[in-house]
């Protein structure tokens, strides 16, 4: 197993143990019945957040993406980007980070942006990409500030076609972002990694979800984003 594969499998295992990645029967926002659910909101204490940040930082450095700073879209991205900046500094790569407010302030420092000045090549840090709305807003903010969106860094790529349970699109939200903005989307792990984890989990209860996850992949899935 390559070092990158080990990192991805380590993240899946960590997410399962933290209760962030769970198995059962879940209805997604698109109305699809999924055999797994990824809830990044459960990374809710200092130790878990610190570990997540390490995964983000290592994945970003290993990706080869050239970057000068990080941007965290409100709200989840704020914590994720700031924690990742701390982890990067611990790895010898100290960069600035910024985030946006949902509502601009008209007093104090004012405006909708907080943190380091947006400049150079900016990596957008978020948990997942669903409809791509957060990415679109982030790209606009970054470009309007005179900086360049360099990549999007996410926790999990579901590798799932857009649409709903009946109308299934040709591409995933991640692929749409890459095509529209011409920048890479880097994920710590994806659905293929989840299937690999279930193959070797050694837990009969988990192994039972492997066939369901594979069937879901066959129906709604797309090829992995490289």
UniProtKB/Swiss-Prot annotation:
An example Gene Ontology molecular-function term = orotate phosphoribosyltransferase activity
Cofactor(s) the record lists = Mg(2+)
Q: Which residues bind orotate?
A: 37-38, 130, 158
Write the record's keywords in alphabetical order, separated by commas: Glycosyltransferase, Magnesium, Pyrimidine biosynthesis, Transferase
**Could you say which EC number(s) this protein's record lists?**
2.4.2.10
Binding site residues for 5-phospho-alpha-D-ribose 1-diphosphate: 29, 75-76, 101-102, 105, 107, 126-134
Please list the reactions this protein catalyses.
orotidine 5'-phosphate + diphosphate = orotate + 5-phospho-alpha-D-ribose 1-diphosphate
| The UniProt record lists the keyword Magnesium | yes
Q: Report the top EC class in one word.
A: transferase
Q: Name one GO biological process term.
A: 'de novo' UMP biosynthetic process
Function (record text): Catalyzes the transfer of a ribosyl phosphate group from 5-phosphoribose 1-diphosphate to orotate, leading to the formation of orotidine monophosphate (OMP).
Quaternary structure (record) = Homodimer.
PANTHER family listed in its UniProt record = OROTATE PHOSPHORIBOSYLTRANSFERASE 1-RELATED
Write the protein's name: Orotate phosphoribosyltransferase
Its lineage reads: Bacteria, Pseudomonadati, Pseudomonadota, Betaproteobacteria, Burkholderiales
């Amino acid at each position: 197993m390559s070092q990158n594969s080990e990192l991805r499998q380590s993240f899946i295992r960590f997410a399962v143990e933290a209760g962030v990645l769970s198995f059962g029967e879940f209805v997604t926002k698109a109305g699809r019945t999924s055999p797994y659910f990824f809830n990044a909101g459960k990374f809710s204490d200092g130790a878990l957040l610190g570990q997540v940040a390490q995964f983000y930082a290592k994945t970003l450095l290993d990706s080869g993406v050239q970057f000068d700073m990080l941007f965290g879209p409100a709200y989840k991205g704020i914590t994720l980007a700031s924690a990742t900046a701390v982890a990067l500094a611990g790895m010898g790569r100290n960069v600035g980070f910024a985030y946006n407010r949902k509502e601009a302030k008209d007093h104090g420092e004012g405006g909708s942006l907080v943190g380091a000045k947006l400049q150079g090549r900016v990596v957008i840090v978020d948990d997942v990409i669903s409809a791509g709305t957060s990415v679109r807003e982030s790209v606009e903010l970054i470009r309007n500030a005179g900086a360049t969106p360099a990549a999007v860094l996410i926790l999990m790529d579901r590798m799932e076609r857009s649409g709903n349970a009946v109308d299934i699109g040709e591409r995933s939200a991640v692929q749409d972002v890459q095509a529209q903005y011409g920048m890479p989307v880097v994920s710590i792990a994806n659905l293929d990694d989840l299937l690999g984890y279930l193959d070797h989990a050694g837990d009969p209860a988990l192994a039972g979800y492997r066939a369901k996850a594979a069937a879901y992949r066959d129906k709604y899935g797309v090829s992995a984003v490289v």
